[in-house]
Amino acid sequence: GDYGSGLMWGARGVGAFIGPLLFRYFYGSSDGKLLSTIGPGIMIWGIFYFLIPFSTSLYLTVFLLIIAHCGGGAQWAFSSYGLQILTPDKLRGRIAGIDYTFYFSMYTISNLLIGYLATKYDILLLFRYFPMLGFLFGFIWYLQTFFVNIVHIVFK
């Protein structure tokens, strides 16, 4: 009901708030370390969203959402930060605007897609496949940035 929905929406916000703080605390505050957490952040989101359909209680679901959005919040914060440090001052506002436009466009499109697919397929099936897809994207991002960091270290 409304109580459960409110708790779950709140859990997303709590996770998105504390995620970047926790990642910064555990990974360090240098630019390279923060930017290297983007892939793991996406993977954490995927793992914990994948576990939600197996949850047996509202409070376990809330916990899983908090952890998932710790990863998602860190990913969004540090990818936005990465764009800011790599963008020249005179273009920064425009690039940030484009970033937010893409983010909210993809958020809308993915919600519409999942809403449509939920009318055709079992919602629990979708709740397993979409997080796996997110995890896969995070893993690919991690591998790409890992190898870029290795090449940078070796050839520096």
Ranges and model annotations:
Residues G1-K156:
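C-terminal transmembrane bundle of multi-pass solute transporters/carriers
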